[in-house]
């Protein structure tokens, strides 16, 4: 099954996540199909916290992709911000 989930990057104690479409059988930081955004949980000041390509999220969900719990909350936040 294809899932939309977070892929961890950044430095020790400074996480930075890419939002990716990946096969659920792959490892967390392994190969992915498409990068559709990022999430910076430690953003401060003017730094951008979240960027998602909502059109691509809708495309993948329409084609049967599942969302991880955290990504589902992030998509909901992004939709609120876009409205």
UniProtKB/Swiss-Prot annotation:
GO terms, biological process: translation
Pfam families per record: Ribosomal_S16 (PF00886)
Keywords: Ribonucleoprotein, Ribosomal protein
Keyword Ribonucleoprotein: yes
Coiled-coil regions listed: none
InterPro entries, A to Z: Ribosomal_bS16, Ribosomal_bS16_dom_sf
Cellular compartments per GO CC: cytoplasm; small ribosomal subunit
Name used for this protein in its record: Small ribosomal subunit protein bS16
Species of origin: Pseudoalteromonas atlantica (strain T6c / ATCC BAA-1087)
